[in-house]
Amino acid sequence: LDINGKEVSLSDLKGKYVYIDIWATWCGPCNAEIPHLKKLEKQFEGRNICFVSISSDRSREVWEKFVKNRKLGGIQLHMGNDRKFMKEICCYGIPHFLLIDRDGNFINANMLRPSDPKTREILKGFERI
């Protein structure tokens, strides 16, 4: 569910490249990536790349407060106690980043972090496609 309680599916994002961030409010390295992720979101705003952040926080209340206080952008989702998605993609630690193509297929299931300068260049390459 997103920050407004609306269900969001990957099929809703078809036609766009999707950069996914799996994170949690309590995760120091995750928090360190937030300013870099915000910068990427701003640079690619209105383009064919969508940014989705999926929180693995157990408490929806803690997550909602954090998202609102930090004014996080992109599509903000909360997985709660359901770790099915993380198991399916073999995600055993956070932060974890993924890149999905316009048809919903994985391009990279272990994508670089937003703080890595190569990430911007990779995403820029998809603008031309």
Task: Show the residue positions of the predicted features.
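A short beta-strand-turn-helix
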Residues: L1-V18
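Flexible loop/turn segments at secondary-structure boundaries
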Residues: E7-V8, W26-P29, R58-V62, K84-M86, ...
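Conserved redox-active cysteine motifs that mediate thiol-disulfide chemistry
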Residues: K14, I22-K39
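Active-site acidic short loop of glycosyltransferases
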Residues: K14-K16, G46, L72, C91
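Structural microenvironment flanking redox-active thiols in thiol-disulfide oxidoreductases
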Residues: A32-R70, N81-K87, E121
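Thiol/disulfide oxidoreductase modules built on the thioredoxin-like
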Residues: R70-L72, M79-F126
